[in-house]
Each structure stands twice: as C-alpha cells, then as structure tokens.
C-alpha cells in the first residue's frame, strides 16, 4: 500500500512539475516580429498570449520591440479588404492586451507594413544596443524581411550578439526580400526549436477555461484567438485555437538555449497566466 501511495505521489509531482515551467530567462532583451496580415490569422492569439506571458512573468520591460503585419507584399489568397481588416485586428490584439494586462506603457506596437521606416529604425536601434552581456533575441513570428532590413541598417559588429528564434520553415521561407539563409549570412545565431503547432494549435474546447474565465483579462486573450477561428480567409483554423508562435516566447522565458521548454503546452500557458491573475486581481 505504501508503495502505491509513493507511486501516486511521484506521478502527481511529475505532472505538477510539467505544468509548472521554471521561469529562468536568458540574459538579454527580446524583440518580436509577427505577421497577422498574411492569410493565416494565428498571430492574433499568438500576440495576445505572448504579451500576457511576458507580463505574467514580470519580463515585460525586456521586450524592446514589437511589430506586426510584417507581410510586406500581399498575396492573392487574402483580399485587399481582408488584409486591411487584419492590420486593425492585430493592432487591437497588441494594444488591447497591453492595456488590460499592464506593464507595456513605454512600448510602441508598430505596424510593420504601414510604418515600415519607423519599424526598421526601432529594431535596428535594439540591434545596435546589443552586446555579449546584453544580447537581442528576435522572435521570428512572421516573414523574415523586417529582420533583414533591420540587420542591413544596423552595425555589422553587433550582429554576433543577435539570436533569431524560429520554429517553422513556413515563416523562414516566406520572405519577399530576404531568404532565411540571407538572414543567417548577417552573422546572427540561429535558434531553432520544434514546430509549436503540435501542442499549441489545438481544438478550441481546450481553451474553454479562458472563454469562461472570471477575469476579463483572460477572456480578452481568448477573444483574440477566437477572432482567428472565425476568420473567413482560410479554413484550416476552423475549430482551432492557435497561439503557436507564442511557444517561442515560452521557450525564451523558461531558459531558451539553457533548458527552455521546446514543446510548450496549453497547460503550461494556463498555469503561468492564472498564477499571475490570482495574485493580481483587478
């Protein structure tokens, strides 16, 4: 009987540890470049979760750049009118999450396509501020072109202190002006983790806890992902709640190349966000 109890305790402890990722970010700052104006609307949920994770782990001050709508050349799979909507939706995901969760008052959320020069200048500034003790981790949550333009406009000697995190070749190979190899040719470090769609693009019922949450901050995050599910440009998000790109942020806040969570889960995201909300009531 004692052995059975011990086994149960071990299993429970293991499950708890799996759901309780250790927050141990690497040194340096983080920048996020997302699309959202491409046919796939998944960056709506990804943006909301990314910002909420950074706030929930008290790392919001280390986010030094956030830009969205980085797909600079519209493709025929999304109409001009639908793409126009996406710009507004992505700005709402950024500003709405930031205001409700707090902590991002000093950060400007750039529309990369509509504020191209300002976006490149801001990311270049972050690159130029990098050093061995304060590297810049760039989360590639969209096409690589903005990253390429910013690297080209920044100081070459700073590129050795830049790390670009990616999880899917669909982003790497989607550039209109830069290939993935051309990004690496700048001398940055490639940090590649597994496809985050595996555990973070899930049946929307797995997010019912957020939909029915008592805290409106969590409901707002859920709503951003729901907007992607009801979007009518693509069909592959129907019935899904997708925050896959936020898996790269989860990887970073849990250690990145020093043991970071490479295959994030909804349970881990939930644990972090609910832990913050329970201690920071409105």
Predicted regions mapped to residue ranges:
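Sec-dependent N-terminal signal peptides
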Residues: 4-13
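Bacterial Sec-dependent signal peptides at the C-terminal "C-region" and cleavage site
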Residues: 12-22
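N-terminal acidic, glycine/proline-rich low-complexity segments
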Residues: 20-282
